UniProtKB/Swiss-Prot annotation:
Belongs to the heat shock protein 70 family. The keyword Cell wall biogenesis/degradation does not apply. InterPro entries: ATPase_NBD (IPR043129), Heat_shock_70_CS (IPR018181), HscA_NBD (IPR042039), HSP70_C_sf (IPR029048), HSP70_peptide-bd_sf (IPR029047), Hsp_70_fam (IPR013126), ISC_FeS_clus_asmbl_HscA (IPR010236). This is Chaperone protein HscA. Keywords: ATP-binding, Chaperone, Nucleotide-binding. GO terms for molecular function: ATP binding; ATP hydrolysis activity; ATP-dependent protein folding chaperone; unfolded protein binding. HAMAP family: HscA. The keyword Transmembrane does not apply. GO terms for biological process: iron-sulfur cluster assembly.
Length: 616
């Protein structure tokens, strides 16, 4: 159905033209780029078959290098070799210097206090450095896919704030990339394992990289990942494992001199090689600086046990912040190369009471999840799987009195979008309002899809129609709907989040649209009838209150006429004759006009009592 062939604005709408999209894991230590080919997500290697790209840029007057070549210059030209720039993203110079006092770069502050790094290529900010890394990844993807990228999904830590996320977007734009979306790294990892379409519940993402450890506790509900808590240790990672093992080898080899950088490098290289080998073997032989010996996995485990315990303490804190227990976690996803260490997997499994997910390469899992998301957003999914991600596929609205649906955001509205409407109370003294969020094209609640319900409480007890409640619908770029209801005079509010596309197939969307057309005339008549019945109920409710308060203003004959008109309205309101109800409402209005005028006069006299003409 052509209506459902929705693409990202600015992209070709050719139904059979596959668009080129990529997922980018812009990491602190290493970065990757991935794509979906023949239905499979895979990371893209360089000419030498290396999938990881070190997140390092070396700047010179005549240009710059990125990746392995740049990393090789780190020791000789420290000031011009920028690494771990992700730590600086979105931070002020003062913040960076307080957090990382030993960085070897020459910093200068810009007029707004943001950091500038003084290099041989001039003053550069973290956005520019990140852009150079992104350009290198994009070039790898374009060459591998034989074409320019139509869009990318870039992953960011779940704890990144708005400034850090905006900095990442700015870097992508500077690199000439169209950002389809920023995706939280733990969410990307969960998507890679297909958990977004699995059982609802709590998911833990344990991310142990080279230099940092992050733990994220997510809740999957109706297709939406909610970040419940994040934690970790920014100064703990696989590099610490390497240094502990290198120091152990030094002791075994009897090397006392720590000033020889060549020996230091040799020891560290030997430690890294041994660590990797011990993931599969129980024993590994080491030959370094003229010393030969054996290291067992048990010895290595003893060295790193305290560090692994530190990660589990961070996990416990994150679970406490999230308000859940380890046994509440459905799945544990392992991310980061250091999670290959058997002791890490063993201890994590013991802590959560379940075997962690490790089938996907932990170095690649985040990039793979981003690639899957990018493939969906760019419009490459077949018709049977495609959902409308860039427009509202079905109207969103609220249930109002009489079982009617008041549409707030119409179908085919481009997202992100926000719309608001004002509503009021139906009864005198009403202090709460039930908000029922609906989806669909029909006029009555019974014919639409219920999305969510919540209540707004604390409304001041005013006469019917006296309180004003603003209901705001906001749909973000991910298709996530937030509905907020706020009483204007007090500011009390309540809200809920839901993903309208969750559980919907294209055929269901098409069927709902078709039904709205087929039953259009019938629905309009049903709405008109319901509206008249609601108005009749409102008139009778208001009249009952007025008679209770001021019946003394009427003669017996006048009261009888009003009672007869009200009884007639009450009777016809039970039927299905719209015109009869409308005429009965008009008759009640006619019979009560004099009564209303007397009530108004009485109210004015009461208001003026005790005041002189001059005061008025």
């Amino acid at each position: 159905m052509a209506l459902l062939q929705i693409s990202e604005p600015g992209l070709s709408a050719a139904p059979h033209q596959r668009r080129l999209a990529a997922g980018i894991d812009l990491g602190t230590t290493n970065s990757l780029v991935a794509t979906v080919r023949s239905g499979q997500a895979e990371t893209l290697p360089d000419h030498e078959g290396r999938h990881l790209l070190p997140s390092v840029v070396h700047y010179q007057q005549q240009g710059h290098t990125v990746g392995y070549a740049a990393r090789d210059n780190a020791a000789q030209d420290t000031a011009n070799t920028i690494s771990s720039v992700k730590r600086m993203m979105g931070r002020s110079l003062a913040d960076i210097q307080a957090r990382y006092p030993h960085l070897p770069y020459r910093f200068k502050a810009s007029v707004n206090g943001l950091p500038m790094i003084d290099t041989a290529a001039g003053l550069l900010n973290p956005v520019r450095v990140s852009a150079d890394i992104l350009k290198a990844l994009a070039a790898r993807a374009s060459e591998s896919l034989s074409g320019e990228l139509d869009g990318v999904v870039i992953t960011v830590p779940a704890y990144f704030d708005d400034a850090q996320r905006q900095g990442t977007k700015d870097a992508a734009r500077l690199a000439g990339l169209h950002v389809l979306r920023l995706l939280n790294e733990p969410t990307a990892a969960a998507i890679a394992y297909g958990l977004d379409s699995g059982k609802e519940g709590v998911i833990a993402v344990y991310d142990l990289g080279g230099g940092t450890f992050d733990i994220s506790i997510l809740r999957l509900s109706r297709g939406v990942f909610e970040v419940l808590a994040t934690g970790g240790d920014s100064a703990l990672g696989g590099d610490d494992f390497d240094h502990l093992l290198a120091d152990y080898i030094r002791e075994q080899a009897g090397i006392a001199d720590r000033s020889d950088n060549r020996v230091q490098r040799e020891l560290l290289d030997a430690a890294i090689t041994a660590k990797i080998a011990l993931s599969d073997a129980d024993t590994v032989r080491v030959n370094v600086a003229g010393w030969q010996g054996e290291i067992t996995r048990e010895q290595f485990n003893d060295l790193i046990s305290a560090l692994v315990k530190r990660t589990l303490l961070a996990c416990r804190r994150a679970l406490k912040d999230a308000g859940v227990e380890p046994q509440d976690v459905l799945e544990v996803v392992m991310v980061g190369g250091s999670t290959r260490v058997p002791l890490v997997r063993e201890r994590v499994g013991e802590f959560f009471g379940r075997t962690p997910l490790t089938a996907i390469d932990p170095d690649k899992v985040v990039a793979i999840g981003a690639a899957i998301q990018a493939d969906i957003l760019v419009g490459n999914k077949p018709d049977s799987e495609m959902l409308l991600l860039d427009v509202i596929p079905l109207s969103l609205g609220l249930e109002t009195m009489g079982g009617l649906v008041e549409k707030v955001i119409p179908r085919n509205t481009t997202i992100p979008v926000a719309r608001a409407q004002d509503f009021t109370t139906f009864k005198d003294g009403q202090t709460a309002m039930s908000i029922h969020v609906m989806q669909g094209e029909r006029e009555l609640v019974q014919d639409c899809r219920s999305l969510a319900r919540f209540a707004l409480r604390g409304i001041p007890p005013l006469p019917a129609g006296g309180a004003h409640i603003r209901v705001t619908f906001q749909v973000d770029a991910d298709g996530l709907l937030s509905v907020t209801a706020m009483e204007k005079s007090t500011g009390v509010e309540a809200s809920i989040q839901v993903k309208p596309s969750y559980g919907l197939t294209d055929s269901e969307i098409a069927s709902m649209i078709k039904d709205s057309m087929s039953f259009a005339e019938q629905d309009v008549k049903a709405r008109m009838l319901a509206e008249q019945k609601v108005e009749a109920a409102r008139v009778l409710e208001s009249l009952t209150g007025a008679l209770t308060a001021d019946a003394a203003l009427l003669s017996a004959a006048e009261r009888q006429c009003i009672d007869d008109a009200a009884a007639h309205l009450s009777a016809v309101a039970q039927g299905d004759d719209v015109d009869a109800i409308e005429q009965a409402i008009k008759n009640v209005d006619k019979q009560t006009q004099e009564f209303a005028a007397r009530r108004m006069d009485q109210s004015v006299r009461r208001a003026l009592k005790g005041h002189s003409v001059d005061e008025v």
